[in-house]
Amino acid sequence: MAPVASRRVRRRVRSSKRPDARGRSAEDWWWDRLAPRGSGYHLLQADSMLLVLPDLEPPRARAHRRARRRAPRSLARGPTAVAKPRTKPRPEPSLDQGLDSGWGDRIPLEVLVHIFGLLVAAHGPMPFLGRAARVCRHWHEATSHPSLWHTVTLSPSLVGRAGKGNLKGEKKLLACLEWLVPNRFSQLQSLTLIHWKSQVHSVLELVSKFCPRLTFLKLSDCHTVTAETLVMLARACCQLHSLDLHHSMVESTAVVSFLEEAGSRMRKLWLTYSSQTTAILGALLDNCCPQLQVLQVSTGMNCNNTPLQLPVEALQKGCPQLQVLRLLNLIWLPKPCGRGVPQGPGFPSLEELCLAGSTCNFVSNEVLGRLLHRSPKLRMLDLRGCARVTPSGLCHLPCQELEQLYLGLYGISDGLTLAKDGSPLLTRKWYHTLRELDFSGQGFSEKDLEQALAVFSGTPGGLHPALCSLNLRGTRVTPSTVSSVISGCPGLLYLNLESCRCLPRGLKRVYRGLEEVQWCLEQLLTSPPSAKEPT
């Protein structure tokens, strides 16, 4: 079979005739047009195709070879002439020889580890450390430093079809981890597993044996996570205090067993809402995690329309140290409290409350008061989609140094009666600390917005306000109000004026950066009065 195959593909052999010879055929002319001499390409003819392929040899070496072949030979004069030995041409220095090949060895190991640490912090340890370890022994020693492997993300590559290919990729990566974990992960602190379907137990078993300093574990889109696996990890890693189960199929019994084992040291917990979330919240209400600081419950890819009934006062007693509470895109309602029941202990350490959602929710002034009546340290309040909350209810909150306030309504205010006044109550209370403000979709009148935003242009004492982000999308803000806000807030870096019906055409867009915001101010100040009429 080999001789037959060799006859099918052949390389075109050029004729020894000169290009300008009279006997040159049309075929030779086309071959020279497709692959001219010295172009670095040659032709390969098959049964039904013609391939133009690059030469494998470098052009410089080929030029030297042709120069030697074309050099005229010296004729011997007489019978005693002796042929002179052919001298090889002196090779030209290459680029690699011109550079100093030992510069990497002269860098101290501590400096090299620090440089690699900067790269790892920006892009992660893999695949950079694996490639750098092949450069030289000095670099291999630097990449093996355990401090460079404190944060690792492991995701098997998909080979072939999604089902069988993922299992093949998991087994291949697991074989590498059997050497990598005991030799590199001794100081591992943060581990993230993504898209693991069947080998989660094997990976976490290796981690429990060789990673005693693990503090954070994230399982994203992982399956077959059992209670035995999580309990084994909780017992082996005594410093583990953060667990992220966002978008993972984990049984509630496994999470409850883990919290019973490691709940006393838990600081952060991320959950995806499902029908089993109530059992996990029940463990939190029983004071299973008294030191919990961050709690996030959000919907997954498949939205669950079953409302979550949250006992607010019981959560305040079970998690008194809570600093961040996020209930994202949930349909939830607080458990009603009976008449004459005193208020709960509140969240005295709460700094961030996020109740944003894209659907109608049951958050009102009364619910907000039950959550924040004892939260003076609140810095961020996200109420996007909470159309039932009014400015009069917000101004009674005990927090005095709010920095981020989001009240945007994105497409859910249709058919609802929105407040047309009250925005000055918010800006007058928090103008000295507000850095980000979102009024998008609110129904405040032109005069009400003018009074509210005028606070940022006339701050007492000559101090500039801290406002750097302002979202007025879909509001009735006027050009004069916008220009006064920009003039009074020199640090404004984000301004959203989309769908503002009172602004002229050409200015209803998003402005990012100081230059774009100042350009908007120039257009408002220099445009004629006729152009400032609403369109």
From Swiss-Prot:
Keywords on record: Leucine-rich repeat, Repeat, Ubl conjugation pathway
Region described as Disordered: 1-25, 61-99
Alphabetical list of Pfam families matching this protein: F-box-like (PF12937)
LRR repeats: 169-195, 196-221, 222-247, 273-299, 304-329, 330-357, 360-385, 386-411, 415-441, 474-499
Organism superkingdom: Eukaryota
Compositionally skewed regions (Basic residues) per UniProt: 7-16, 61-72
Residue ranges of domain F-box in the record: 54-106
Record-annotated disulphide pairs: none
GO cellular component: SCF ubiquitin ligase complex
The keyword Repeat belongs to this UniProt entry's keyword annotation: yes
Complex and partners: Directly interacts with SKP1 and CUL1.
Role: Substrate-recognition component of the SCF (SKP1-CUL1-F-box protein)-type E3 ubiquitin ligase complex.
UniProt cross-references to PANTHER family, sorted A to Z: F-BOX/TPR REPEAT PROTEIN POF3, F-BOX_LRR-REPEAT PROTEIN 6
Protein name: F-box/LRR-repeat protein 6
Source organism (scientific name): Mus musculus (Mouse)
Biological classification of the source: Eukaryota, Metazoa, Chordata, Craniata, Vertebrata
